Amino acid sequence: MIQNVTDDKIQWKCLESKIESQRIHYGRFAIAPLKKGQANTLGITLRRTLLSDLDGICITSVKIDNIKHEYCTLTGVRESIQDILLNLKEIVFKGVCDKTQKGFIFVKGPKKITASDIQIEPCIEILDSNQIIAHLTEPIDFKVELTIEKSMGFRLQNATQISKDSFSIDAIFMPIRNVNYSIHPVEKAGDWKSELLILEIWTNGSITPKEAFHQASEKIMNIFLSLSNSSDNQIQEKSTKNFEEKEEFIFQNIDGFKQDKETKVQESLGWKKISINQLELSARAYNCLKNEKISTLFDLLNYSQEDLLKIKNFGKRSFEQVVNALEKHFDMKLSKDSSKKFYEQLKNLELINNKDIS
């Protein structure tokens, strides 16, 4: 508990900032004084914005000479194609990337290929040039073409190749690795009705936690500024016209509603491609899920919190691991309702049948 806060003006301060590794930067911030309830509202808003609304740069597709599918093997290359794609996925970029960029690797073995071997435009740079991509054990030519993009959030790989000899990969654009917050009571004028918000931010090194904090704050501020810029008179004058425009817009877009639902279904079915390995669970929790035939996030999302606790040998600790991992890696939560809820949501869209989600 923190005592004797007298200033009414909300202030923030960086309590700690350190570089844990080249790809993990940590920052801890304090925001106070806040009225009771404001700290939780602000903490949730900042966390959501940090995890979903900040731009990042990463590789989105890869073209490797003489490779037609990801299960091929290359003579003279120690790693499998899947391993190479995973290594490329982990490379962190920073800089300015207003349009899609191309990167290239042209090397001859034997050689250890690292991120420093990637030829890219000077507007972007690789954070950790020592990241290993592959090992060439024989004197072979190794040629790779990379597509590098800037966006927000993450993008699941396409089910099919983008073009001949080219593969899309799961692109994680978000520069934020994790965000935690905690709320502490503060004494002010003899009572404990004020609160202090502690915010912890881990980034991938492409931006500092302080930069991430500023960017998220600006995005939140811009949202509220857009709401406050219109006066009551302006709102009153436009209300009738806006209603008519919205009514016309709604009826014009009825035909497009089915297409929107199809998009929602495709996004939902994309979770079938993400293995529960990505949750980094303990062996016990992982084996319990596998025994229950839960292999992907899509499978897991069809279980409610209550359903998970009913799984044989699946205790409270394993349950907490799954819940925390879902929130940490994908900012998702399991439903508290029936285990069939996720399936039913897809079925209710009237665009899929049991065959689509089996």
Swiss-Prot record:
Region Alpha N-terminal domain (alpha-NTD): which residues?
A: 1-231
| Source organism superkingdom | Eukaryota
InterPro entries xrefs: DNA-dir_RNA_pol_insert, DNA-dir_RNA_pol_RpoA/D/Rpb3, DNA-dir_RpoA, RBP11-like, RNAP_asu_C, RNApol_insert_sf
Subcellular location, in the record's words? Answer: Plastid, Chloroplast
What broad class of enzyme is this? Answer: transferase
User: What are the UniProt keywords, alphabetically?
Assistant: Chloroplast, DNA-directed RNA polymerase, Nucleotidyltransferase, Plastid, Transcription, Transferase
The record's EC number reads 2.7.7.6
Chief subcellular location: plastid
Q: Which reaction does it catalyse?
A: RNA(n) + a ribonucleoside 5'-triphosphate = RNA(n+1) + diphosphate
The UniProt entry, under Pfam families, shows:
RNA_pol_A_bac, RNA_pol_A_CTD, RNA_pol_L
Query: A single Gene Ontology molecular function, please?
Result: DNA-directed RNA polymerase activity
> Per its database record, what is this protein's job?
DNA-dependent RNA polymerase catalyzes the transcription of DNA into RNA using the four ribonucleoside triphosphates as substrates.
On assembly, the entry states: In plastids the minimal PEP RNA polymerase catalytic core is composed of four subunits: alpha, beta, beta', and beta''. When a (nuclear-encoded) sigma factor is associated with the core the holoenzyme is formed, which can initiate transcription.
Q: What is known of its domains?
A: The N-terminal domain is essential for RNAP assembly and basal transcription, whereas the C-terminal domain is involved in interaction with transcriptional regulators and with upstream promoter elements.
**Belongs to which family?**
Belongs to the RNA polymerase alpha chain family.
- State the protein's name: DNA-directed RNA polymerase subunit alpha
